[in-house]
Amino acid sequence: MRLILLGTPGVGKGTQALELSECLHILHISTGELLRVEMENKTPIGMKIDKYMNAGELVPDTIIIDMLEKRLQEPDSRKGFVLDGFPRNLNQADYLKSSLERLQTPLDRVINIEVPIDTVLNRLLQRNRADDTPETIKYRLEIYKQETIPLIDYYQRAGILEQINGDASPEEVTNRILACIG
C-alpha cells in the first residue's frame, strides 16, 4: 500500500502516518522529519533548511525532491509507504508520479484529512515546536492555501483521493482512514 496524507499543518498527518505504518506494516516517510534530521546534524543542507523553516517558508522543491528520491530507492520503501508532508505543490506531485512510475510503484490512495481552522490553530500552538509561532503558523496556512490545495483537485482527477473528517480522536480518524482504503 502506497499512501499520501494531505491536510493543513496541524490536522494530525504525522500521528496518522505513524498509526497507518504500524497497522499496515509499511514505511512512514516524513519529509518534515527528514528535514529536521538534516538540521539537527547541522549538515550544509541542514543549515539551508533551517533558514527556510525558521522563516515559516517551504523548503525549495529541489532539496525535498533530492532527499525523497534517495529515500524511495531504499529497499524497505518497496513494501509500501505512507508519505507525510509530501507533495506540497503540483510540481512535487508531478515529480513523485514520475519517480514512482520509474520504480513501478504507483500510488494507491491519497487521503485528505479535513479539520476546522480553529482546531488546527489550537493544535499547532500546543505542540511546542520552535517553528510553530503564531506568525509562522499564519504564513504556513497561507502557503498551504496557495500551493497545496490544488493537489486535492489533482488527485481527485486521478481518481485516488479520499476525504476524511479529522475532527475526532486520533483512533477514530485512523479507523476512518482504514475503512476508506479497505
Feature roles, as predicted:
Residues M1-G182:
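Glycine-rich phosphate-binding loop of ATP-dependent small-molecule kinases
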